[in-house]
Amino acid sequence: MNVHTPRKDEALTVTTGPLPASTKIFTAPEGFPGLKVPFREIALHPSAKEPPVRVYDTSGPYTDPTAQIDLERGLPRTREAWLEARGGTELYEGRDVKPEDNGNVGEKHLARAFPVRNLPRRGLPGHPVTQYEFAKAGIVTAEMAYIAERENMGRKQAAANAAHRIAEGESFGADIPEFITPEFVRDEVAAGRAIIPSNINHPELEPMIIGRNFLVKINANIGNSAVASSVAEEVDKMVWAIRWGADNVMDLSTGRNIHNTREWIIRNSPVPIGTVPIYQALEKVDGIAENLTWEVYRDTLIEQAEQGVDYFTIHAGVRLAYVPLTAKRVTGIVSRGGSIMAKWCLAHHKESFLYTHFEEICDIMRQYDVSFSLGDGLRPGSIADANDEAQFAELETLGELTQIAWAKGCQVMIEGPGHVPMHKIKVNMDKQLKHCGGAPFYTLGPLTTDIAPGYDHITSGIGAAMIGWFGCAMLCYVTPKEHLGLPDRADVKEGVITYKIAAHAADLAKGHPAAQLRDDALSRARFEFRWEDQFNLALDPERAKEFHDRTLPKEAHKVAHFCSMCGPKFCSMKITQEVRDYAESGMADMASEFRNSGGEIYLEEADAAVKASNRALGGKAAE
């Protein structure tokens, strides 16, 4: 089902409705009866004699058939009541939208502003505002209780065999509990090991957590460019990404209408939204990096914080002294934000204003509880440049900035590479933990080889699974279009599914106590030839069914005990089932014979036969 919103120049369309055999359910955490935490339950065929399989759900109201979706009004502002109850914030008029906020685009090409304007909210002096500050004060927020319920999949006690699953895994020092309590969430946030990206101006948000001791999360990038896309396409891509499992979405728009595009996305997003503010700041100075100023950047931070952006990528670790370290690289500086700041540093021959004004940036972000995503502006753009001096010099600076941000009451995660061959991945995780005090790591892949343009979702998915296993908390997806063009709707889905696989593989390897439940359910369905259950339990039910039906399209084939790979005579699972049936039949026959013979364990005739056989084999000694 699609929802349309008329526009003066285009129709805004998003996909709604449940996935196959799926039902949206809600549970409430104990002690917080007003909270409704969403999950998806996948119904199985009655022959399975199993309950529905419950899975984590990022799709928001868009897959709830009872929800009334109105893109013109945005999603319900559920967290507003939580914020009011906590106190410590105020509504205020906010800044006016300026022509430069949308790239000085003329009226003809200006995207329509979001129809509803809500007053922005900011923190009051002397009160905790950020989730980090509440956690440090020993306060369990509604967001923390919501997250505990979400990470536990609504269970009220540890999953069966939880301790065994944890013991089987290799978590490389992570501390994954059998059961997550709100107090555990609070403790992880207070220690800086996890963040809850949740701007107080994004009340439509369904809270989630990013941290090494929780489920591995994934981020999907969307956004227009100077040559492609529109508001409608980007809102559609956001809804499409979360339908398939994106936990977070970054709006990396660099073209016209940046402000209005972002407003439409945030107001209709149930997941955290991140941005790179330097992109919009650059648009405000006509794309000339040397003309950037602290004042322009500061204004951009406030603009985006008032809109509700949940985390900012800020490349404050790109220092003047580090830029020459990239001179001998094969691919130089590949981060857009990093290259912008490097050019500014060289043009002015001084430290970046992101570095020199970092404490002021912290003060702004704390007022709105915008989380830091400290950008790796000097990440390697080829495996030849992996783990070089420039990359790790910046990482050490990010560790120093993390301590400053924590002291200011802000939440922090650290961005990582990039392009790294498999044998060089683990040292990245180890160094990040060492230098950044355990703050969550968030990596782009990494891509493990450079020879596969068009398939970089695969080259990076390999690295993502590995670094997720080693302790990376969030994986930024890579699509097949990486290095080639702006991703479209199909690319977004391909990237999200690839990274859901990587994140889930990491959860399994770490020994997450409930990660294997879905795998086991699908394996049972596969062995029992419950084809529809196999499709429905898959990350992409549509593709699974499509591939099956290309060669066996009839409904009768949905109950067949074979697929087109092996056919009816060579299906290993069918043969195995026949062997089992034969063995069970044979055991039943033997049991019947035993009972018919009187139930004696030793029979005289049999005993005599055994002795005769033993004599033939080796005389009386064999007896």
From Swiss-Prot:
Indicate which residues the UniProt annotation says bind substrate.
N221, M250, Y279, H315, S335, R336, G337, D376, G377, L378, R379, E415, Y442
What UniProt keywords apply to this chain's record, in alphabetical order?
A: 4Fe-4S, Iron, Iron-sulfur, Lyase, Metal-binding, S-adenosyl-L-methionine, Thiamine biosynthesis, Zinc
Pathway participation = Cofactor biosynthesis; thiamine diphosphate biosynthesis
Write the Enzyme Commission number(s) for this entry: 4.1.99.17
What the entry lists under Pfam families is as follows:
ThiC-associated, ThiC_Rad_SAM
InterPro entries per record? ThiC, ThiC-associated_dom, ThiC/Bza_core_dom, ThiC/BzaA/B
Give binding positions for Zn(2+).
Answer: H419, H483
Cofactor(s) needed by this chain:
[4Fe-4S] cluster
The record's family statement is: Belongs to the ThiC family.
What task does this protein carry out?
A: Catalyzes the synthesis of the hydroxymethylpyrimidine phosphate (HMP-P) moiety of thiamine from aminoimidazole ribotide (AIR) in a radical S-adenosyl-L-methionine (SAM)-dependent reaction.
Q: Which HAMAP family match?
A: ThiC
**Could you tell me what this protein is called?**
Phosphomethylpyrimidine synthase
Its lineage opens with:
Bacteria, Pseudomonadati, Pseudomonadota, Alphaproteobacteria, Hyphomicrobiales
